[in-house]
């Protein structure tokens, strides 16, 4: 493996944050400098955490996942007040979801090692599975290439109610068939059988979406010491009761802080992402097997426009008796994470960094400082045949990441003829319009009744010129089919659906091509935290 770093222009909050823009930096509590991390460590030492209770739960959960000895040792180390975490999270996508989930885990593992070395204290990697998320449609699919087209393969396991991913049961039989269909689109290799067996073993040990996800991640990162936490685990909820009570009792302060911070973000020229009602409580409650967002109305806490209603006392009693019925929303999830874990750094994707910029004052409501927010590593894989295609087309390795491939393709095709096709036809259309405009004026002077027909005549001539242009382009494309197929392969491999590779493709393709140790080898590479895009040549 060889890594090439490419500077890819980023827009909005994350782009300015990486460039250390002074304005957006004020929306975060720590600079990403050695001094910033040391200050964070100092601040954490003045905080109290329920370490022993957390360790007991994490040991039980990770042992169920058959985590390796390095993970168990890291969990046990958390009982020590001088142990801290690098943390990040994601939804429980089927087959681990898009590549960026794996890349986020790699980022967490890498940064934990680096911070342990630079800060001189124990730092362990933690991945937070967003098990409370109830939008199964966001995690129930993957993309493949089939019949030379990109196809979305959906696992049809419909849930009519808004059940969390931690509680959404998964049919092993149906999911096995779905996985078989996915692997039929991959070339059979020396690794295919082992990879399928690896996935099947994880599936057969699972009963829910989160189970399946957690077992795959545990296996893929077996020797890294990675600790997993399911944010919707009933035993974890028991540790969260006291903080849920604080959220409920201070919801007005939370909403005011969110509003004030969003005003600052607006003043800096950014559009806020988080949308909430003024009476939002920022807590979900499970009612009749459905996840219901709570709101305040006339002194009551209501759900579904008043269908469900609770007094403050009733809600607190319900929390104490059944904490597993409660979960966080986008505003309070980071707060709960901060309450539970002594976090030396949070790893976030572009979207997360944008919405975290809106939460600074919300953290301060609870006397928390927002942890250092570190952009996750971004990675693309470039296979040998793709590198060959690039060179054949006289493109630079960075071109697919910084330029529009469709425009590069059109430019290449135009260069295959002596004169630019589009310019020639544009010129012809303009000349024709000038001639026809003069002709229409002449016709109109002699017979005004033909004015409408003359207009139609012009449009038909225009259509015929456009038809001729299309036919010429089609013939050119057929003539240069071999080269244009190379552009298509580049597009599918590196910019599928016009998006970054890591937002579309799944890790299973690469496991099938390069073996079960593929993720381990990628994790062991050296990366820069300077905002560049890492292209790994395979």
Swiss-Prot record:
Instruction: List where this protein forms a coiled coil.
Output: 421-485
Among the GO molecular function terms of this UniProt record, one is:
ligase activity
Which controlled-vocabulary keywords does the entry list?
Answer: Coiled coil, Ligase
Cross-referenced InterPro entries: Bacillithiol_biosynth_BshC (IPR011199), CC_BshC (IPR055399), Rossmann-like_BshC (IPR055398)
User: Any idea of its EC number?
Assistant: 6.-.-.-
State the similarity comment.
Answer: Belongs to the BshC family.
Q: What is the protein name for this chain?
A: Putative cysteine ligase BshC
Q: Which gene encodes it?
A: bshC
């Amino acid at each position: 493996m060889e890594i090439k770093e490419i500077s890819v222009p980023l827009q909005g909050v994350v782009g300015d944050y990486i460039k250390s823009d002074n304005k957006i930096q004020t929306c975060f509590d720590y600079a990403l400098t050695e001094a910033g991390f040391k200050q964070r460590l100092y601040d954490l030492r003045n905080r109290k955490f329920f370490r022993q209770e957390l360790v007991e739960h994490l040991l039980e959960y990770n042992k169920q996942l058959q985590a390796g000895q390095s993970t168990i040792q890291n969990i046990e180390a958390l009982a020590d007040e001088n142990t801290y975490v690098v943390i990040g999270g994601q939804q429980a996508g089927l087959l681990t979801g898009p590549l960026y989930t794996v890349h986020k885990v790699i980022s967490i593992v890498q940064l934990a090692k680096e911070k342990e070395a630079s800060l001189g204290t124990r730092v362990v990697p933690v991945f937070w599975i967003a098990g409370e998320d109830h939008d199964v449609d966001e995690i129930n699919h993957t993309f493949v290439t089939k019949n030379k087209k990109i196809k979305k393969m959906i696992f049809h396991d419909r849930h009519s109610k808004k059940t969390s991913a931690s509680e959404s049961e998964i049919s092993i039989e149906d999911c096995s068939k779905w996985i078989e269909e996915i692997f039929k689109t991959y070339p059979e290799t020396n690794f295919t059988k082992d990879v399928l067996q690896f996935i099947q073993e994880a599936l057969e040990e699972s009963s829910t979406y989160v189970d399946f996800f957690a077992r795959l991640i545990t296996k893929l990162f077996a020797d890294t010491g990675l600790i997993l936490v399911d944010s919707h685990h009933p035993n974890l909820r028991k540790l969260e009761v006291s903080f849920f009570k604080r959220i409920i009792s201070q919801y007005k302060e939370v909403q005011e802080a969110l509003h004030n911070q969003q005003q600052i973000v607006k003043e800096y020229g950014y559009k806020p992402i988080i949308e909430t009602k003024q009476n939002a409580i920022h807590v979900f409650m499970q009612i009749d097997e459905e996840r219901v967002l709570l709101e305040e109305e006339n002194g009551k806490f209501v759900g579904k426009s008043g269908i469900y209603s609770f007094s403050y006392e009733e809600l607190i009693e319900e929390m104490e008796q059944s904490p597993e019925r409660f979960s966080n929303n986008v505003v309070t999830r980071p707060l709960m994470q901060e309450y539970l874990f002594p976090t030396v750094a949070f790893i976030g994707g572009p979207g997360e960094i944008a919405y975290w910029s809106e939460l600074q004052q919300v953290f301060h409501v609870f006397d928390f400082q927002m942890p250092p927010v570190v952009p996750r590593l971004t990675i693309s894989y470039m296979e040998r045949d793709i590198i060959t295609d690039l060179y054949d087309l006289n493109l630079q390795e960075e071109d697919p990441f910084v330029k529009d491939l469709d425009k590069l393709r059109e430019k290449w095709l135009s260069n295959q003829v002596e004169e630019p096709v589009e310019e020639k036809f544009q010129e012809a259309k303009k000349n024709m319009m000038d001639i026809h405009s003069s002709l229409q004026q002449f016709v109109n002077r002699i017979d005004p009744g033909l004015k409408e027909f003359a207009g139609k005549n012009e449009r038909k001539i225009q259509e015929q010129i456009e038809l001729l242009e299309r036919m010429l382009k089609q013939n050119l494309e057929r003539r240069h089919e071999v080269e244009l197929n190379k552009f298509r392969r580049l597009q599918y491999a590196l910019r599928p659906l016009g998006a970054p590779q890591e937002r579309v493709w799944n890790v299973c393709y690469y496991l099938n091509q390069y073996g079960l140790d593929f993720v381990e080898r990628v994790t062991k590479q050296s990366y820069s935290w300077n905002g560049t895009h890492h292209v790994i040549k395979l």
